Amino acid sequence: MAGIIGGNLTKTGILGIIAGYPNEAMETLLDQYEKDVRQLAADRKLPNATVLRAYANSWEDEELGKEIANQMIGKGADVLFIYANKVGNGCIEAAKENGVKVIGFSENQNDLAPGTVAASIKFDFGKIYSWILEHYMDGKLNGNEVYGVGIEEEIFIPIFTDEVPKEVQQTVENNMK
């Protein structure tokens, strides 16, 4: 979802990913985002599609988020995907100051900076907890495994602003089916 949005919003073909602490599930999600935005940028004939990725190793340091975002913006990034809790607030502030678009993750961040935050991918914690409990009770979960859960289970919910063209919104919705 976020990859479709980012790959269609970028004008430079340079996108940034800013995350908190890396973990296996996060890496899988960010790798997919990177793959999707590179492909969409290439399909749109944007030369040298580049994805910059940085980990703050923090969920709280807003100033560090702003610093990382400014570094990426300085390298030409015009769309930032943020998976970083409060660190993301600093990223959004830098994006707003520089006219760069943001895609938020986990919570609806659209109202934090209208015109800057183009969309958010909300993570429905209630649905994931229900999925986990159901699968645990049915004996379907094994320890030390990562499960591909999300879109089909309607755990990830895109929330768009008018910054995302209707045809891109429709593409995202079609890919969720």
Regions found by a protein language model. Give the residues of each.
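A residue-level marker of the well-folded mature domains of exported/periplasmic proteins
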Residues: M1-K177
